Amino acid sequence: LAPDGILTLDAGTFGAPAYRAIPFTPPQRMLAPIAGAMGFGVPAAVAASLRHPGRQVICLVGDGGLLMTGSELAVALERGLPLKVIVSENGMYGSIRIHQEREYPGRPSGTSFTNPDLELLGRAYGFPVTAVR
């Protein structure tokens, strides 16, 4: 993260390590949702990039959150915003599934889904895409 960079996080199990592992010093910023509000990361990154042109903005988002509000990337395309979006793709609402497995072992419901081709989606929004598997 750049010395004045902004990191936006979405809700989800993938984001928890970021809270502990990424050191922040002013004027760096981390923008994250309260109470598990999925879909926060991408719109927050777009807003941060619009508000602070010239500052590096990186978004960490799960595939579930991306599918909820990822269409906001159209604004990034339209405005030529240099966002970096890192997507954790596991095909499930991980936090919800963990709670279901705890309360109803072996009976998760409605937590898995099939993603579109996220690499193709990123390219469609004009982003250079690198897949790490």
List the predicted regions and their residue ranges:
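Thiamine diphosphate
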Residues: P17-R133
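Active-site pocket-lining segments that scaffold enzyme catalytic pockets across diverse folds
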Residues: L1-T13
